[in-house]
Amino acid sequence: EARYLHWEFVDPDSIPVCGFEWIHWSVANLPIDALMYDFNDSHALAIPPDFSRQLPAMIPETVQGRNSSASKFLGRSADPAVIMRYNGPQPPDKDHEYYLQVWATKKPLPGLNQGFWLNELLHALRNSGEVPDTDGIFLTGKA
């Protein structure tokens, strides 16, 4: 039975705009129990408002990865509140199809610290010793 969630929220439609898929948010080792708002319904999960900014204080064992604002090609802020939190969609040219991919595992993924890179999450999933449950959805962001 899955006990931890991990996800990436990315923008493949940013590739023609900036030359790479924009990472908006990545999270690892979030205990599913921490999101349950109805303990009588194991599928009733909720993410509270401003979750990304509140997460370090609310659930310290959960780690957030760097978003694309951390890219050395952008010269943006080194502030963890900017580069290691949710970075909301702002399609600059047209509507974009964003992709949310979620994985569920029985155990937390080892070796991931605050500010991990997305490839480290993918390696940790592949090397976890289990086949994670996974699902994804495309979400449209309006220009």
Regions found by a protein language model. Name each.
Residues 1-143:
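N-terminus-centered regions that define maturation/targeting leaders and the start
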